[in-house]
Structures are given as structure tokens and as C-alpha cells.
A protein has these predicted regions:
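Flexible "arm" and connector segments at domain edges
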Residues: 1-53, 57-95
């Protein structure tokens, strides 16, 4: 599935709720899902990890839509490797 297709599907499915909730509320829901992913890491259950990553991806699409950001355009920043050094793999110094 392309990012634009995902964003469109999520917008059609949840867009009215997302707009009613607003950017702040939608972002907070996404952060909750990040917490659920952290719990899934502790359990090391692949199916649970996959589920939570999918939820975060869906919420990120919602946040992007409410903020007026196109996911395809945002992802383009990484299309040719590291946006800082321009290399694949990244050769930036590790902080």
C-alpha cells in the first residue's frame, strides 16, 4: 500500500472524528499508541508489535491529515538516504 493510499483510506474512515478532535487531541491519541508499542516491546510478541506499529502508522496518517501534511511528500525527505549526509547507510557521527 502506498502512503498516499493509506492516508486517503484513514482520512475517509476517521477524518470526521479526527477533525472534531483537532490536531492536539489526535496527536495525544497517537502518543498513547506509542506507549502501547513500548509495552509490546517488553513482551517481544511479533504479532502484537505488528499490530501496534500498524496503529501508530494509522494515527500518524490522521495527524498528518489534520495538520495538512502529505505523507508521501514528508517521506520524500528520506527517498535518497540520510537527509543530513546523503548516504546509504548513514555516515553521520553517532551522538
Amino acid at each position: 500500500m502506498e502512503l498516499s493510499e493509506l492516508q486517503g483510506t484513514i482520512r475517509r474512515t476517521y477524518g470526521d472524528r479526527d477533525w472534531s478532535r483537532g490536531l492536539d487531541g489526535t496527536f495525544r491519541w497517537m502518543v498513547e499508541e506509542v506507549g502501547e508499542l513500548a509495552k509490546a516491546f517488553r513482551h517481544a510478541d511479533h504479532a502484537e508489535l505488528t499490530h501496534e506499529v500498524g496503529d501508530i502508522l494509522a494515527w500518524l496518517a490522521s495527524v498528518a491529515s489534520v495538520a495538512g501534511v502529505d505523507l508521501e511528500e514528508a517521506a520524500e525527505r528520506y527517498a535518497h538516504g540520510c537527509p543530513t549526509c546523503g548516504n546509504i547507510p548513514c555516515t553521520c557521527p553517532v551522538a
